[in-house]
Curated annotation (Swiss-Prot):
Organism the protein comes from: Bitis arietans
Key word Disulfide bond present: yes
Name of this chain's protein: Disintegrin isoform D-2
Localization terms from the record: Secreted
Keyword Secreted among UniProt keywords: yes
The protein's role, per its UniProt record: Inhibits fibrinogen interaction with platelets. Acts by binding to the alpha-IIb/beta-3 (ITGA2B/ITGB3) on the platelet surface and inhibits aggregation induced by ADP, thrombin, platelet-activating factor and collagen.
Ranges for domain Disintegrin: 2-83
Family matches, as SUPFAM superfamilies: Blood coagulation inhibitor (disintegrin)
Amino acid sequence: SPPVCGNELLEEGEECDCDSPANCQDRCCNAATCKLTPGSQCNYGECCDQCKFKKARTVCRIARGDWNDDYCTGKSSDCPWNH
């Protein structure tokens, strides 16, 4: 089935989906188009801060046990597993 903008599910072709335009509180996401607002790189994620990717080498997951700290890449909002 085709993606439905405004259902709060990130589907194929959507960059974000923050509910209906009346209910969306996300300044990084255009609720009418389900695309990021101009100048925004992201709208969520451990490596996203105020609509921008966090800088490379920013710790996004603290070391535990035998694992090392995990760091943002500066190119994604996801925190990669580096162990």
